[in-house]
Amino acid sequence: MTERKQGAAAPRPLNRPQGESPKATKLPATLLYADPLPDDLVEVGYVGAAYGIRGWIKVEPHANDASALLHARRWWLLTPPQAGLVATAEASRAQAVCVRVAQSREHSGTVVAQATGVSDRNLAEALKGRRVWIRRADFPAPEENEFYWVDLIGCAVSNEQGELLGEVSGLIDNGAHQILQVAYALPDGKAGERLVPFVDAFLRTVDTAGKRIVVDWGLDY
């Protein structure tokens, strides 16, 4: 159940038919979330559309494996951050919505869900475009020797000789396997990047709790 870019993939563009203007629907106070946001929120998708006429929403997951989204019973629906801001939960804080998920299921590559308090299509349409965030604590436990990509970000990567290769800044899925993007500083101070296949042939240890990964990889590769 290794996640595929959980919270890291760029959302697909939302297209509105030409000439159609968005209709403003006031969100009920019961949906608005005024408390401080949890510090372990992870972006896992976005609301692509309303689904049906009874307030269901359709979510486009960022990951091919939507198990984390289906497992969580509480979602934070946040507006996209303004241009130039880092995509964090706090950057999307304006009029935060928090919903409890009564039902959810996979549907043709998406996840459709019924949220408590969202009772009609107009209200569901008002949530369109919002990013869906869930707590990392609400992810299902991964199986042995499998990892969520969000847990690998920020891990220090060293080789068996004790040489520091850099820090995981992102991941790539090339269809055959996953690849660690390892950021490091070049001698001139500019940013460099190493691409290390995340496969058994090169992996030695992965300690997500200690944020450390050891690989069979040279500094000159």
Curated annotation (Swiss-Prot):
InterPro entries: PRC_barrel-like_sf, PRC_RimM, RimM, RimM_N, RimM_N_sf, Transl_B-barrel_sf. Coiled coil: none annotated. One of its GO terms (molecular function) is ribosome binding. Keywords: Chaperone, Cytoplasm, Ribosome biogenesis, rRNA processing. The keyword Cytoplasm applies. GO terms for cellular component: cytoplasm; ribosome. It is found in: Cytoplasm. Residues 1-23 are annotated as: Disordered. GO terms for biological process: ribosomal small subunit biogenesis; rRNA processing. It comes from the Bacteria. Pfam families: PRC_RimM (PF24986), RimM (PF01782). Residues 144-221 form the PRC barrel domain. An accessory protein needed during the final step in the assembly of 30S ribosomal subunit, possibly for assembly of the head region. Essential for efficient processing of 16S rRNA. May be needed both before and after RbfA during the maturation of 16S rRNA. It has affinity for free ribosomal 30S subunits but not for 70S ribosomes. Belongs to the RimM family. The PRC barrel domain binds ribosomal protein uS19. Binds ribosomal protein uS19. PANTHER family: RIBOSOME MATURATION FACTOR RIMM. This is Ribosome maturation factor RimM. It comes from Cupriavidus pinatubonensis (strain JMP 134 / LMG 1197). The gene is rimM.
